[in-house]
């Protein structure tokens, strides 16, 4: 049975493809989820992709990742990244290797987007790579947890 990583997307990410395409691109959430499943699969991992517009439900997803012994978490908490101590605390509480992703470069946008509570609970944070940031995040997470790309030779 494949180890599972959780890919969690927060508020408004269900609107990808139509919401501010000049900022977020034209890819949809379904495109992101396929990219994540394919990338995780390259490492023999399964991606459990979830999205919610509600902070409490995102926290429940994080707790579920812990209960199901997920190997890692990739999270794009959207606007909650900048406001949610509760999401930060949930990520810290479960102690699962986590990578934060943002499609846009949050540091090149409004001042209120420059701070991220969730980044402090992650071992890495990526922003500004578009949806390719998810692929990069899974690559980094796979390296962190020791997952090897299918067909890759393991260094001894």
From Swiss-Prot:
Belongs to the type-II 3-dehydroquinase family. Transmembrane segments: none annotated. One of its GO terms (molecular function) is 3-dehydroquinate dehydratase activity. GO terms for biological process: amino acid biosynthetic process; aromatic amino acid family biosynthetic process; chorismate biosynthetic process; quinate catabolic process. Pfam families: DHquinase_II. The gene is aroQ. Keywords: Amino-acid biosynthesis, Aromatic amino acid biosynthesis, Lyase. Pathway: Metabolic intermediate biosynthesis; chorismate biosynthesis; chorismate from D-erythrose 4-phosphate and phosphoenolpyruvate: step 3/7. Gene3D superfamilies: Dehydroquinase, class II. Homododecamer. It comes from the Bacteria. NCBIfam families: aroQ, PRK05395.1-2, PRK05395.1-3, PRK05395.1-4. The record marks 19 as: Transition state stabilizer. This is 3-dehydroquinate dehydratase. Substrate binds at residues 76, 82, 89, 103-104, 113. The keyword Lipoprotein does not apply. The active site is at 24 (proton acceptor), 102 (proton donor). It catalyses: 3-dehydroquinate = 3-dehydroshikimate + H2O. Its EC number is 4.2.1.10. It comes from Nitrobacter hamburgensis (strain DSM 10229 / NCIMB 13809 / X14). Catalyzes a trans-dehydration via an enolate intermediate.
């Amino acid at each position: 049975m494949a180890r599972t990583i959780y890919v969690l997307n927060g508020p408004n990410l269900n609107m990808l493809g139509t919401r501010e395409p000049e900022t977020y691109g034209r890819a949809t959430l379904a495109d992101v989820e396929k990219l994540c499943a394919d990338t995780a699969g390259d490492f023999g991992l399964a991606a459990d992709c979830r999205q919610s517009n509600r902070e409490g439900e995102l926290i429940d997803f994080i707790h579920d990742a812990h209960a199901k012994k997920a190997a890692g978490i990739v999270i794009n908490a959207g606007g909650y990244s900048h406001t949610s101590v509760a999401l930060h605390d949930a990520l810290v509480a479960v102690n699962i290797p986590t990578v934060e992703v943002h499609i846009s470069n949050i540091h090149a946008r409004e001042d209120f987007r420059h701070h991220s509570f969730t980044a402090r609970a992650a071992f890495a944070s990526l922003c500004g790579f578009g949806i390719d940031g998810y692929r990069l995040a899974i690559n980094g997470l796979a390296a962190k947890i020791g997952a090897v790309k299918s067909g890759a030779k393991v260094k001894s």
